Amino acid sequence: MTTPPQPRKATVFHDVRPFGGPARELVAVDGLLVDEVPPGAVVERVDGGGRLALPTLVDAHIHPDKTSWGEPWHSRRPAHGIAEYVAGDVELARALPSPVAERALRLMSHAAAQGTRAMRAHADVAPAFGLSGIEGVAEAAGTLAGIVDVELVAFPQHGVVRTPGVAELLAEAAASGLVTHIGGIDPAGFDTTGDRDGDQLGTVFALAEKHGLGLDIHLHDRGEQGLAPLRDIAARTSALGLQGRVSVAHAFAVAGLSARELDETADLLAEAGISLTTVALSETTILPFRRLAERGVRVGLGSDGVRDSWSPFGDADMLHRAWLAAWALDARLDEELEACFRLAADGGAELLGLPRADLRAGSPADFMLVDGECLPQVVVDRPRRDLVVRAGRVVARDGRLV
């Protein structure tokens, strides 16, 4: 006896205003938006109440393993330089009552409820932690499967060559099957060899090539100390055929370039297929993402650390991060405010290799409903996410997962 085929399911979101336009319906089938309900489909209807429909967002750079989100308040000590901040990471990790998996899940769930559909998460790999950070974030990501997509970076925050044992742990992480990327950090300024021989970039590029992983390297150094490693990364990327699989985070040296130097550097990065991420710290550190995009460089926006030993601030809300980008750039015009939202929505999606959630037929049914008149106003007001939809399924209401 043949079992009759099950009817398709369609969810119709009624009375929504994509990007603040006229009210209409959005129809989701099999995780995608479609023009109309298929014949014979079983229909579920959701009332949008005239709210704006906007794409959900992508956090291209976040550190969930370090967070104290939801934990007792932690008073921070003065710190100067990466080495002292790193020592603070170890101190905080030992002081927090909850393991990485619980803290990361708490933060990542909050991010998803605020409209984050995907993230690239960095987790520290060092003798002080072993692989516990990676394992904890991977566990949290598994719990949230189908709600938020997670790429995971094995990040050598303590340095690859300055801290014995890190290179071996990175190799273990690369072979674990848990990570999608290998990280790196300031090979010229922080992770210097001193009296030890070592080549951080050589180590991480070799691991990425061997295991078929991507690379995501932190570069905080400014001036030539930051630009020289950037050129080295571009050269290694091209030589190994890793175009499209390498990202550089922060890249503060790029933020301070003249127009001519910026275009030259952008062309170098575009040719090597290297992406950048920015975290909108200030007007002197945020990357000129619109000009970089014009020259062919993909740029994503990220939360960075959230309430960790480095800073008491951060909330993993990417709409807030778009607001911070607009504030750092002194955005006034509607098009400038919209560009900051697009950075959070489309920039990160392109960096992670995801299709844009642009609310058109054929695009992922990933969107959020908010009160507001228009997109620029939403960036400024940061209204509550009344409804968050992932693959056509309501996953959060009123800022909380359902």
Model-derived regions, located:
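N-terminal metal-binding scaffold of metallo-dependent hydrolase/deaminase domains
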Residues: 1-41
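Divalent metal-coordination and catalytic microenvironments
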Residues: 16, 31, 50, 61, ...
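C-terminal cap of metal-dependent C-N hydrolases
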Residues: 34, 361-402
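Active-site gating loops and adjacent loop-to-helix segments of metal-dependent hydrolytic enzymes
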Residues: 67-100, 229-247, 265, 316-332
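Alpha-helical scaffold segments that flank or form the walls of functional sites
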Residues: 70-122, 128-143, 171-175
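Active-site core of metal-dependent hydrolases
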Residues: 147, 151-164, 176-287, 307
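His/Asp/Glu-enriched, well-ordered alpha-helical/loop segment
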Residues: 235-246, 290-372
